[in-house]
Amino acid sequence: MAEQQGSAVDTRPGWTAGFAPLAVPIFRLVWLASIVSNIGSWMQTVGAQWLLVQDDSSPLLVALVQTASAAPVLLFAIPAGVIGEFLNRRRVLLWSQTVQLAVVLGLTYLTAVGQTTTTILLASTFVLGTVSAIQLPAFQALVPDIVPPKLLIDAASLSSIGVNIARAVGPAIAGLVVAQFGVAAVFLLNALSFLVFLGVLLFWKTYSPPVARPEPFVDATRAGIRYIRHSRIVRRILLRLAVFLIPANALWALLPTIAKNSLGFSASGYGLLLAALGAGSIVGAFVLPWARRVAAVNGVVLTSSVVFGAGLVVLVTSPTLWITFPALVATGLAWIGVIATINGTVQAFLPVWVRTRGLSFYQLVLFGCTAAGSAGAGVLASVWDPGLVVIGAGILCGLGGLSLLVWPMPATSGIGRGIVEVPGVEDRPRPDGADDAPVLVVIRYRIPVERRQELLDTMTGVQQTRLRTGARAWQVYVDADDPGSVIEAYSVGSWREHVSQHEGRTTEFDAQQIARARAMSTQELEVTHLLAIPLPHHRGVEKRRTRDKRRSIPHGT
């Protein structure tokens, strides 16, 4: 957070509202460096795909390059979110960029001497995807550390725009480089792109990571999963992302095959197709901030989905390139419209205590659907004509966008996301081992019997709040001997985690849910905290549990 304090935002008239975060010097440097690095990564993917196309590999193998790049997120996204939450994010990025640089340099040499086999290519792509999966949540969670809170939504959108500009521009450059210099040159340029990002990270020595309460790795992972499980809004947004991505990735997976077999293009022609998509992405970077201010999130995603789907159909059916290329420009713009809008919405909505872990689930959906969509498109293209597969994908994208008319994403504006401290946990010494002991919290509400149902209806919001912030089980009871009492009981994994619920996990919206229920009690709430004590025959298990819990992630290392 120190970086925010040292960087005044430039408010000169030349800065439009959507691009205001670029006035923060370190954000501007990191943003530009990440675009360069991501451009190199997408050049790498296209180079790998074209290497297989040159060898007349099947469409399935070509599509598997995308799958090998994206699939590691399915394995490592959630642990990566925990790592990015508690370790120094700058160091995570330094480490990941260095490893990727070494892998790409090795692959460049093997390709230059003609020794790159399909197995080596796919294995290297998988390793690069694995390291990328580890760094992505840390990078996205870095944004709130370096820009003022009021610019977070715009900064999140700019980060997503940068990623998607790279996704379109990188392949375009790669196609042109392959045509002139070969695939090895593409891999070498990717290596140089990592050096750019490393240079910025080494230059940036003033980063002071935010102080986070250390948590055991397993508990931190469970907390992230529990939050997503009980956050209906986040689940709905991620599901909307999946609805678009699975069919949409047919474009990226099958474009090399369509360029060569259907359009008769060489590598340079393929590069021109990608250049058109890249041009649309650049236009989208300028159009999207304006679009977000004149249309709701659902309107932007709906329009972009329909335009993207129409672009896929035109790509295959257009009788002339004079129609194909403008359609691809619109398709690139529409891609940015969907992905950047959803990313900005998720990043702005996630509370700070679980933001990195929440973004790891976003990456899980993003890359998991990329892997599934690419592999599925490759399988279908091995059975049917690739052009028909792309047309079908375009129709599905359009229908998915139109479904927003009847099933829109939930509105998130006006929902308080700031963290507030909730009173109720006394700051007094606890017996030895109490921090690791499971806790049962029992709260007694006093309310007239005729208002009981009103309280129970209100408790639905309280239930979701408790479960999102760490409760493992929750239940409400009515005292059979005292009809005027309603009892809320929930269990938490440890006293330490229960303190976190009160001091670092409750958002303004959550506090409102709790306050609404408490206000209905006619007397002061009776709150009891019960600490679990293991029975003698469980003590061996409890000792191992305590030892494991002490293996917390040391923040800032």
Task: Please give the residue ranges for each predicted region.
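Short, highly charged, low-complexity non-transmembrane loops/tails of multi-pass membrane proteins
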Residues: 414-430
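Short glycine-/aliphatic-rich beta-strand segments at the starts of folded cytosolic domains
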Residues: 436-448
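Short beta-strand/turn micro-motifs at beta-sheet edges
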Residues: 427-434, 475-477
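Short, intrinsically disordered terminal tails adjacent to the first/last structured region
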Residues: 1-12, 433-438, 457, 528-532, ...
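Short, surface-exposed ligand-recognition loops at beta-strand->loop->(often short) alpha-helix junctions
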Residues: 445-457
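Alpha-helical transmembrane-bundle signature of multi-pass membrane transport and export proteins
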Residues: 1-412
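Short, glycine- and small/hydrophobic-rich beta-strand elements in well-ordered beta-sheets
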Residues: 463-487
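An amphipathic, aromatic/His-enriched active-site/gating alpha helix that lines ligand/cofactor pockets
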Residues: 466-473, 491-527, 557
